[in-house]
Amino acid sequence: MVAGLTSGGLELRIVPLGSSRPLLVLPLETGELFTIHYVHSVENAPIWEVHSVDAEGRIYIEEERYRKFGAGMGRMPGVGRLVRRGEYEVITDMHMPTGDFVLRIGSPGVDHTLVWRGTRTNLSALAPHRAVRFAARKVSFLHQLWRMVISHGATPG
């Protein structure tokens, strides 16, 4: 019984504000990465934001990658390290806590897309113009085991 109550892992839930039904539910391991990819609405250039979740369920931004600084983009003094990867500016080593956060999903064309374990889910196709909360939580070993047998209907792949 005690084993069922101990921590079994993490779960990231992406839920529209005002709803209890998640768009996505992602099982995660401590430190595992997920990415939000979209096209900047002003600059019309691709952006990648790489996030992680720690053992307590706190969300961090780890890296941002883009072609050029655009409106709302850019470096924060004292956070991360700016490098170039080909044509992209990349802020690495950020490990900046965001906690749970709200994202207003853009329209098709902005294509807010969640990338996780080789899957890509276009949030703009699922819920354009909706505000959604990204929230992570610890789950019990029994919950994790259950989800290994029967995945949540909102888990991609």
What are these regions (language model features)?
Residues 1-7:
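Hydrophobic membrane-insertion alpha-helices, especially the h-region
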Residues 7, 19-20, 41, 52, ...:
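Generic serine detector
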Residues 9, 24-25, 102, 109:
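Generic ordered-secondary-structure signal
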Residues 12-68, 72:
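N-terminal secretory signal peptides
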Residues 59-61, 73-157:
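Mature, soluble, non-transmembrane domains
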